[in-house]
């Protein structure tokens, strides 16, 4: 048998022409094949290009069953923490999130800070600043074509999407007709995936549908007159290329891109063939992918040319040829006009859900925020330079927008708290001056007197300052033991220590008062030990007293018994809750009718023993259970919120961030909401909620702390420091994009003018410039530390790492210094009040107690 085979082989060799050379390679084992991580195109039919014939569309797949998995060592906890910290700060070398941030930054600059440099635009191939999109700045990667296709003629693919396929020279001239690329072999570049999605990645698993998405889909189905189930089960039967929601992570439609809806049937035109961001639609499930892989290979369904009349009826346009504009001189000869024959391929596998209707879809459509060119950039007419480095270009293209969750949550909390505060505490008199109320009120002496109550007006249309302090406003006496307030309270207690009960001769009543205030002709001042009713303590008469309606001899709870006898000092006496003898003790200070009890008035801990009518008229806190001012803690009543751990030492330090969620009135809240829905929301889409939340809260806390140091006796509410900290982020964003802006100095002076205007506006009452200044400085440090930005080379990357450490240390030093000044070394600055309020009139700033005079 072997001899016969050798004879046949030799005969064939004799018949072979001398010029013919046969080179038959030996069969190699499957394991020796070069691994390829591309899936077979025949199985994933939804990846087939419209320009590639089915019989030539084959890409080798790896023999996974013949390859052993590569064993890798598990990453240590230290490496994981280091890599995560580097990714979060934006200094990682191979981080996908860092690349996304950097590629998005330039796009943000183009809308916020003005035009870009011409070289930047030429690098990005963006002739227009109007539509700077993610997909328009991408060039799809070359497709691998097998050896059998290398000899095929290249075709023109008019379906390539995006502005990235325009000719660079034409883009510089501002022309708008797209340049049609030439694809390798018969494979279409745009039919597989973009450079961001990557053909080497598998489709992602579907996310769970949210309630809002299902509700909108049901509403859209009802509007179209069909059941929700029918709309859900409906799926596309014919498709010419991959849906964008299958492979692309984040794409955005723009007017200059091709409307791809002509590939589907007319009945499902508005439901199945829209390409919108990934957060609106979902990716196929793993079960669907397995069904696609297990499905038998089907014959390709190739259709003829599309009917032009049908497309016109559907209001669609099929690009059949290149543009008809005038070509640039010296350009290549125009290629012949070829009408493209479209293929339709069947898609297998179930699909969950249904895409929402067009009106609802347009409602949720949002544009990308180019780095440095956000809302403020559009207002100040900023643009990129005409040329940007390719490394910077890749950083911008990989950036994604974030959802402004923190802005929405903050706006909701601000609105809710403001509405509740106005409903519960009411609205104070509106204006810029003082509001005086005069009335005749019964006082502690038993006669009516004309008294005047002076209230600060609030032009923000909101509660009074006392109500704001009770809600949690920034107020230094509630956050620490203020030296002046503490000395004022100690002086009042010293006067009360030498007081006694003044009993009127007509037995109309009695009140605790000093000897000067008690009439010697109409009343008797019962003073121990002069008065015969003085009790004894340790064998001798008490030296201080008496106290109206309180005596250690008749009090049962708490009783004055050895070893728990009441002290000599009456200011240290407890509140007696039960007397044993009632009103018949034969002691004048016990048998009289008391007409005055402690009342806390004002915001500085001032206490008066007066009648309830007078206390209510002065908007004070009346204590029916006490007889002395030393038995009550007025600062605890004034501050409200959680009680002090030590009643003598205020400790509500949490007012530093609690006041960020309060507002002085309705207008104040509306101003904050406008700022948040414009500037804050725009920046959060760039940096994410976690970075913006850190900068917002820490800037506000630092600003309130500085305000509490220099303006300790002024109630301050609102996120003034936080808002200036967010404005500092705009400056940092401008500095980081300085090299790619066409006119950076113009953008800088515009931002500086806005900040100076707001600072000048802070010279009016109720607006704190100390919070503005400190919040801006702290926000500047935090922005340099926490906001990732574009890096212009390896040296710039190392510089940012040093910058993060330096600015974090500087901010911590600033915060520590303010804490030391606030708690350990209080500062009294007389001229500092002129930085936050200029007294244009005598009472313009006096009503806000900037002189810190206690009364």
UniProtKB/Swiss-Prot annotation:
Enumerate the transmembrane spans. Answer: 412-432, 656-676, 692-712, 715-735, 747-767, 773-793, 804-824
- Mark out the compositionally biased spans (Low complexity): 25-36
Region (Disordered) residue ranges read 1-36
* Claim: Endoplasmic reticulum is one of the keywords in the record: yes
Described purpose of this protein according to its UniProt entry: Regulates ADAM17 protease, a sheddase of the epidermal growth factor (EGF) receptor ligands and TNF, thereby plays a role in sleep, cell survival, proliferation, migration and inflammation. Does not exhibit any protease activity on its own.
Q: Which family does it belong to?
A: Belongs to the peptidase S54 family.
Residues with Phosphothreonine modification: 180, 183
GO annotation, biological process: cell migration; cell population proliferation; negative regulation of protein secretion; protein transport; regulation of epidermal growth factor receptor signaling pathway; regulation of proteasomal protein catabolic process
Organismal lineage: Eukaryota, Metazoa, Chordata, Craniata, Vertebrata
Query: Could you describe the subunit structure of this protein?
Result: Homodimer, or homooligomer. Interacts with TGFA and HBEGF. Interacts with EGF; may retain EGF in the endoplasmic reticulum and regulates its degradation through the endoplasmic reticulum-associated degradation (ERAD). Interacts (via cytoplasmic N-terminus) with FRMD8/iTAP; this interaction leads to mutual protein stabilization. Interacts with ADAM17/TACE.
Organism in which the protein naturally occurs:
Plecturocebus moloch
Q: What is this protein called?
A: Inactive rhomboid protein 1
Write down the InterPro entries for this protein, in alphabetical order: Inactive_Rhomboid (IPR051512), iRhom1_2_N (IPR022241), Peptidase_S54_rhomboid_dom (IPR022764), Rhomboid-like_sf (IPR035952)
GO annotation, cellular component aspect: endoplasmic reticulum membrane; Golgi membrane
